[in-house]
Amino acid sequence: MTDCHAQLLPIYFREPSVNLGLGSQRGKLPHLTGMALLKDARLYADSPEAYAFTSLDFERAAKRYGKVGGFAHLATLVKRMKASRPGALPLDGGDTWQGSATALWTRGQDMVDAAKLLGVNLMTGHWEFTLGAERVQEVVEKDFKPAGIEFLAQNVRTTDFNDEVFKPWVMRTLN
């Protein structure tokens, strides 16, 4: 999972209408939007997939299909995944601890607690670092380590000696 932006409840989510790819990536997935995305992915307009992945006819589609996401739905998916794939490791790709009023008020703690309840095994940060290095370290030490959640980041280093702050990768043997 990734990029829930601290939204615990379902929301009306609108994909961007522009996503510029640079150089050789211009005009290719994942930098396609709208009809170009639907055509490339072989999806139909006026479908649940069009609503989920494009901004086309957003207001009408939102009225038709409703809100998306939320941690209750995500928890159901994680539960199904773990049941059908024993040993699966839910990975949080970041952008989880920020983006809502409650996350702002709690410095991301509401989302940290939600990730622990969800059963996340591994996480890497993204905009979590806007909370500051001390806060990220605090969550890793006081919340994640006791819960058995590993925090990974390959591009976070100390300023003094350029040492890694977090493990850059992990390997697990499953089943």
Per-segment meaning from a language model:
Residues 1-175:
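Acidic, metal/ion-coordinating pockets
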